[in-house]
């Protein structure tokens, strides 16, 4: 009745679909440079550390912009911010495509001096990655508390599969259409994502009623009647302040830094690892990266659902323990087949912990969900920018062992997070 009377746009399912599709296209920028890193590195004369920075640079804006844009959901519902981020990504990709048209990228040394320009445009293209915190907060507001793990799993799980798909598809596009045309195709695909979100994306009911001119109290009552259970406590700044005062927010940030930042980092880094570290051809390197990335993305769904049943804390601890072991195993000589199997163990750990972490945000920070999703999604995803240059630096220090040493970073962080979460969340809860 209320939904019809006020012409409420969307339902929980359609809003989740719109957010998931928008994020799906936006987050593919994680793999923007990974599959082409060898070619771009030769064109610009880059070392391993610089390559690590190149493949991770879309994650810089893709992570940090999550904080303000995620918090703004608590002020305006997020649709406007989502559209802005996708539009910026389209512009960045289009500019990169034009740059690659002007310079013969596949000629070694042809782009010397243009490294800062490519980094800058990579940052702009990475804005689409930042849609995560916007859509995550929208999903939390649209769905009942009992189904937020499911919604977060669908959104984060299906949404992030595009990074793995692109890791496999980009080498195929390069082979079939050439370097420049492949990036123009990516620009068109990102534009499609923008158009789909314009069509399907919708603010949660409370914000729609506010926009229709209802008072905050009336909007809240109407939204309750439509099934919305979570409500913001104030402005974006208020939401950030409230969530920042809750210690568990920062525990979840570190947790997400390790596994979602890790997911972003390895999706970008694995093509380099398989090609330069293991000597595999680009097609196979892309395929192995795609399997790793898509599996990690899809496992967020059962990770979220399992967290609904047994608690996100238990799921997270088990996943982190698996990650700690797998990081050590990546240093054992066993050929690319054995290392690929271990990479799938890392994928399982990432997927389940990412699903569990986002389920825990409304559990521990219900007073400022948008702000918390901004902190967790932003600083958490910042790991995607931090890890690849560190892993590249280790390769520069030891070309023989450095590729394996990089995975010990994940072992260290997994153990650290387990200790912090045990004392900061599990013991306090009981």
Task: Show which residues each predicted segment covers.
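Juxtamembrane intracellular "pre-TM" segments in multi-pass secondary transporters
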Residues: 1-10, 208-252
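Extracytoplasmic gate region of multi-pass secondary transporters
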Residues: 33-38, 246-298
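C-terminal ends and interior cores of transmembrane alpha-helices
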Residues: 87-110, 321-334
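C-terminal membrane-cytosol helix-exit motif in multi-pass small-molecule transporters
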Residues: 96, 188-221, 417-425
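Cytoplasmic helix-loop-helix junction between adjacent transmembrane helices
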Residues: 121-158
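Helix-loop-helix hairpin linking two adjacent transmembrane segments in secondary transporters
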Residues: 155-206
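C-terminal transmembrane helical hairpin of 12-TM major facilitator-type secondary transporters
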Residues: 307-357
